[in-house]
């Protein structure tokens, strides 16, 4: 089936850790990459909607899901091959050969939003169709980052919660400005949509002592990634779909397991 695909390599800073964010590049089509939005622009909440995400089901294309690096295309495809609802979903393709190693590679969706109040819940669905583990630290997660938060201590440029969904059972690295909460510790199930949800407001209250207030923006990432890959071990491959993503009040959550 002919499909347009998106590939890139990029570099970003998350908190105090520096990661290489890259996506394998191959030329499987003659038409070139799909036109897509650029670097992230923080979004005002959609009017009249509880969901703070714009285009949560990718039915309107790729935007405003974005890139963390200037002049590069967001590292995902809008796919019509599989969808939890509607016709589209976001597809992250990991293709890293065995001979390649490195500290980290992250394949991600990201959106930045500027609500007045910190949201309560994140929910959504993921689906894994291909999973070849190239390192023990290959996993799915979503990450919530609040920037310029005056009411949380210690003072950092941002404060994070990280939520591994599948693939690892221990924290993959130490990071001073983040806490890990595991929503799953097993290898990902393949060939089925898996529901996830978490009350992120309660987690910030529990781990950071309060829900963020007065922040400049929120950044939310949905990822497949690895850390600490040794060259020559095994190829790291994954096809991961995300769909029907929600962030807002728990009472208005449209997703049900």
Identify the meaning behind each predicted range.
Residues 21-24:
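C-terminal motif of bacterial Sec signal peptides marking the signal peptidase cleavage site
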Residues 92-117, 121, 173-183:
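Secreted extracellular polysaccharide-interacting domains
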Residues 128-189, 241:
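Extracellular ligand-binding interfaces
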Residues 58-94:
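Extracellular glycan-recognition surfaces and repeat-rich motifs
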Residues 27-72, 256-257:
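Extracellular carbohydrate-recognition regions
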Residues 1-12:
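Bacterial N-terminal signal peptides that target proteins for export
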Residues 58, 124, 141-143, 190-236:
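Extracellular beta-strand ligand-recognition surfaces/modules
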Residues 58, 107-147, 197-200, 244-245:
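Extra-cytoplasmic beta-strand recognition segments
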